[in-house]
Regions:
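Amphipathic alpha-helical segments typified by the pilin-like N-terminal helix
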Residues: 1-36
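Short, well-structured segments within or immediately adjacent to enzyme catalytic domains
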Residues: 32-212
Length: 212
């Protein structure tokens, strides 16, 4: 009986040591996959710009200065990064983040078929906060083009990529960076929406913190 208790105690100790390592490995794998997805988005934007007089995908008239995580409007119109679908990528899953609950790649693919409005896990800057319309414009050097969409509403969490611990950021030259984030709205890369489903929360603080 004593020997059995000793064995159980040893197993418990080993489990307590291994579980954090396993959790860390899973988190790291999601982080790598997230970087891969947002990097693919950057490459698609580059291809799009080469076919469109150097311009990045626009949202729609009147929203040129907005940042948005929307791919498709309820009327079926693809906007912003959604304009990359079909012509520049056939895989809608790249718009999902494995570390953003409810907005993983497979969930985005599922929503493409069943929901009128299609959200991405990533916030697209468009021409807001001083980002020039032409991708290769010198003004865009060291400026971010997209990032994990981390958002908190008055009623609770809506978008919580990587548990608000860090954010994956895509820059105009297609390189990606992973930076520490905070769940406190507007402190780093997390924004706050007045209500669930608000399309255009104030995201200027995100780009202020991403740009170098």
């Amino acid at each position: 009986m004593v020997e059995l208790l000793v064995i159980i105690a040893v197993i418990c100790i080993l489990a307590s040591l291994l579980l954090p390592a396993v959790a860390g490995s899973i988190s790291r794998a999601r982080q790598i996959a997230c970087c891969g997805n947002i990097n693919q988005i950057g490459r698609c934007v580059t291809l799009y710009s080469s076919d469109n007089q150097g311009c990045i995908p626009n949202i729609q008239p009147g929203m040129e200065q907005s940042s948005i995580p929307i791919l498709r409007l309820p009327n079926g119109t693809f906007i912003a990064l959604g304009r990359l679908l079909n012509s520049y990528t056939a895989d809608v899953r790249i718009f999902g983040c494995p570390g953003s609950p409810g907005y993983e790649g497979d969930k985005i693919a599922e929503n493409l078929l069943r929901t009128p409005m299609l959200w991405s896990a990533y916030l697209y800057r468009s021409c807001s906060s001083g980002f020039a319309e032409r991708l290769a414009d010198p003004a865009n050097v060291d400026k971010a083009l997209a990032a994990d969409f981390a958002c908190i509403t008055a009623s609770g969490e809506q978008f919580a990529p990587h548990d608000y611990m860090y954010s994956t950021i895509l820059y105009s030259d297609c390189h990606t960076e992973i930076r520490r984030n905070s769940r406190t709205p507007f402190e780093l890369y997390t924004v706050q929406a007045a209500r669930h489903g608000e399309l255009i929360p104030d995201c200027s603080s995100v780009w202020k913190n991403t740009d170098k």
